[in-house]
From Swiss-Prot:
Pfam families: UPF0184. Residues 66-99 are annotated as: Disordered. The gene is bbln. Residues 34-71 form a coiled coil. Belongs to the UPF0184 (EST00098) family. One of its GO terms (biological process) is intermediate filament bundle assembly. Residues 66-78 have a biased composition (Basic and acidic residues). Its main location: other. Essential for intermediate filament organization in intestinal cells, interacts with intermediate filament and regulates intestinal lumen morphology. It comes from the Eukaryota. The keyword Hydrolase does not apply. This is Bublin coiled-coil protein. It is found in: Cell junction; Cytoplasm, Cytoskeleton.
């Protein structure tokens, strides 16, 4: 018969019980592995913090560049457009045709 979640009914046999004993060597090995994992996680956290700092600097630099670019566009929008050499050549040709 299955349980309330559809899981099969499993007997308690084969399940680790609190009575199981680990010797000191096994505890030391587990402790060593946990220390290594902790060290790796600390290293990952440091790298993550460094990358986050660099990304924040890049983001601020990008914002400043966009702000400067917008300001340049605004400043240049107030100026008349530069004369185009093609327009002058066309006007010269039109004047020559009339003569």
């Amino acid at each position: 018969m299955s349980g309330p979640n559809g899981d099969p009914d499993i007997s308690a046999e084969g399940i680790i019980e609190d009575e199981d004993e680990f010797n000191e060597e096994e505890y030391a090995a587990i402790d060593s592995m946990l220390d290594q994992i902790n060290s790796c996680l600390d290293d990952i956290e440091e790298r993550n913090d460094a990358l986050n700092g660099k990304l924040q600097e890049l983001l601020e630099s990008n914002r400043a560049a966009r702000r400067d670019f917008r300001q340049q566009i605004t400043d240049h929008a107030d100026l008349p457009p530069p004369a185009n050499d093609d327009d002058e050549d066309e006007q010269s040709r039109d004047a020559q045709k009339k003569d």
